[in-house]
């Protein structure tokens, strides 16, 4: 059994709706274990660094502003096929295209305020996890 880890961020819009517990319940029911978590207010520098890959995209500044507009819940999830399993739970980036019952279909307002972030590959997951968590902060379960 090969375990993967993925980074998940519950974004300010979903935090403001008080649905962290609902989302965590979905993770756990899908077999994703939470092995690290932080509730925090991102600084502009943290948000810009995390989304640096999008720096030249027209939505970059709006994305950064949104991500610093309120607290976020950041977690590392672990399971077999964690990246794909988490992305399936999230649904399409645009909640209008997300399948019913997915996190974005149920909790997101728009493509900009889409409730959650999930790593898009195992390679990016490793980079994203390391951006927010030291190895000593991840607890094996």
UniProtKB/Swiss-Prot annotation:
Q: What is this protein called?
A: Nucleoside diphosphate kinase
Q: Which SMART domains match?
A: NDK
Q: Which gene encodes it?
A: ndk
Q: Tell me which residues bind ATP.
A: 11, 59, 87, 93, 104, 114
Where is the major localization of this protein? cytoplasm
Active site, renumbered = 117
Per the record, what are the reactions this protein catalyses? a 2'-deoxyribonucleoside 5'-diphosphate + ATP = a 2'-deoxyribonucleoside 5'-triphosphate + ADP; a ribonucleoside 5'-diphosphate + ATP = a ribonucleoside 5'-triphosphate + ADP
Keyword NADP: yes or no?
no
Q: What does this protein do?
A: Major role in the synthesis of nucleoside triphosphates other than ATP. The ATP gamma phosphate is transferred to the NDP beta phosphate via a ping-pong mechanism, using a phosphorylated active-site intermediate.
Q: What is its EC number?
A: 2.7.4.6
Annotated TM spans: none
């Amino acid at each position: 059994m090969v375990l993967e880890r993925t980074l998940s961020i519950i974004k300010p819009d979903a935090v403001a709706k008080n649905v962290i517990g609902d989302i965590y319940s979905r993770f756990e029911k899908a077999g994703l274990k939470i092995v690290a978590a932080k509730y925090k207010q991102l600084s502009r520098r943290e948000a810009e660094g995390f989304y640096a890959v999008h720096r030249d995209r027209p939505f970059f500044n709006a994305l950064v502003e949104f991500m610093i507009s309120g607290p976020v819940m950041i977690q590392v999830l672990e399971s077999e096929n964690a990246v794909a399993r988490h992305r399936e739970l999230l649904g399409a980036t645009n909640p209008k295209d997300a399948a019913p019952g997915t996190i974005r279909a149920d909790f997101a307002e728009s493509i900009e305020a889409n409730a959650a972030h999930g790593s898009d590959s195992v390679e990016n997951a490793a980079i994203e996890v390391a951006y927010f968590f030291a190895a000593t902060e991840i607890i094996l379960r």
